[in-house]
Structures are given as C-alpha cells and as structure tokens.
Design a protein with these regions (language model features):
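Buried, small/hydrophobic-residue-enriched core segments of structured protein domains
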Residues: 1-4, 8-158, 168-174, 178-179, ...
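Short hydrophobic "strand-cap" motifs at the C-terminus of beta-strands
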Residues: 165
Length: 251
C-alpha cells in the first residue's frame, strides 16, 4: 500500500510542475495509523511536508499546516473577528512559518485585506526570516490566486506565498497550472490519503455555536455555507416502516 501511495503521490507532485505539494489527508485516512504511514509514504514520494504532527515526530520529517475555519469563526463572525483570529495566530506562532486562511467569509473583500493588515501590524514583511503566506480553500482558485498576488505585490508583500487546498488532485492541479494560477504551494488530502477504489466519506467539521452564541462560516462557494446555531437531524419518510427513510434534513 505504501509503495502504491508513493507512486500516486509522485504523480501528483510531478503534475504540479515541481511546485511544493504538502500532504493534508490525515482526517480522511482509513484510521489513525493509516494517516501516519500514509503521510510517511507521501514524504518519501516527494511531498514537501505533512500536516500529521505524529508522522513528523516519529520519522523526523517536516510537518506543516495552517488554521481551520472554526478557529477563525471562534473569534466572531465579523470582519473584526477575523482580524482578531489572524492577530492571535501570528502572536502565538511568531518565529515560525505563518499561513493565514483567508476564505472563511470573503477572500478578496475581507480575508486578504485582514491578512495584509495583520501582517503589517505585527512587522511581518519580506524581511521576515521564516515563510509567510495566505491559503485559499474555496472559490475559483485560479482567478483568486491571480487577484491575491496582484494585491499582495501592491502592498509590498512580494515574498508572501499563496497556498491552495480544496479537494485537489493531480488533474485539478494540472488544470490550475494551465490556467496560469499564481499558486506557490498545493495542499492535497483525499487524493493522497485514500484511493479511488476505497474513497473517503466527504464530511467536514464546521463550528456552528460557541459558548451559546451561534456562529456561521460564510463562503463564496454556497455549498460550503452552513446554518448557524445548534441543529438536529430529522429523518423524513413517507411510508415508515416499509420505506426506511427518504431524506435527512439538518435544521
């Protein structure tokens, strides 16, 4: 299995025109140790890093990662809340690589602007001795990456890297490259950690309530938007028990 993953991972790395590819598949792997050894196989195949900290600890390979949408939402579903999240993250991880997730609400109208503002407030610029950048996780990645690059350069952040994730595989990466995307590094999860023959269940964690207060993740991709507040799942059936269920509704 490890050798097969190496072959697939190497294919993904090569199709990304030699840009760094990081393994982000732990949450979708078929068990905790599958995640650990799958990440190891990805590193052997040529991935630049893995989000699996245990793999990095056991095998001495580089671990990498950013932040979750739930982290951003936990500071409040407002533009200022996003800024507070970025500021807290930078202050906590100062002296390390800093990658800010900018698509929790709106990539160009607030996420990127908050990232630039927070970088500058904390003295993060092209003289920062570690890596710094922003991550895109939804929307038209090719278009957004071009626009983000223009705005970053206009603000003097020429060394700020653009990372991209969102169910990527070697084919999507190749397509992004053909479109002229200004992406510096790709994060690949499902396509590395699982196979087409035994794929993953495409569920994700979204924060909907914190300390009794509803929170909501906005997105330019409507499929990624959620209802705020505590919810229950209702199973609807026309002819129970003959017909076990027809649809599940969360509200």
């Amino acid at each position: 299995v490890g050798s097969e993953m190496c072959i697939r991972d190497r294919s993904g790395v090569c199709r990304a025109t030699n840009k760094p590819v990081s393994e982000f598949g732990s949450r979708r792997a078929h068990g905790p140790w599958a995640a650990v050894y799958g990440a190891k196989a990805a590193i052997i195949a040529g991935c630049a890093g893995t989000s699996n900290i245990l793999t990095g600890s056991i095998f001495g390979c580089g671990s990498t990662g950013t932040m979750a949408h739930s982290f951003v939402s936990s500071f409040g579903c407002t533009v200022e809340g996003e800024h507070k999240a970025f500021d807290a993250y930078i202050k906590t991880h100062l002296g390390e690589n800093l990658i800010l997730l900018i698509d929790t609400y709106n990539t160009l109208k607030c996420g990127l602007l908050n990232a630039i503002r927070t970088f500058k407030e904390n003295g993060i610029d092209d003289d920062y001795p570690y890596g710094y950048g922003v991550r895109l996780d939804s929307g038209d990645l090719a278009y957004l990456s071009v626009e983000v690059r223009i705005i970053l350069d206009e603000n003097g952040l020429h060394n700020c890297k653009i990372f991209a994730t969102n169910s990527l595989d070697e084919y999507l990466i190749s397509d992004l490259e053909r479109q002229g995307a200004r992406i510096d590094c790709y994060g690949v999860g499902d396509a590395i950690a699982t196979s087409k023959a035994a794929p993953c269940f495409g569920n994700v964690y979204k924060l909907v309530q914190l300390d009794g207060k509803p929170v909501m993740k906005m997105s330019e991709d409507r499929a990624k938007m959620i209802n705020p507040g505590f919810q229950r799942t209702w199973r609807i059936s026309k002819n129970y028990p003959e017909e076990l269920f027809k649809i599940d509704v969360t509200c």
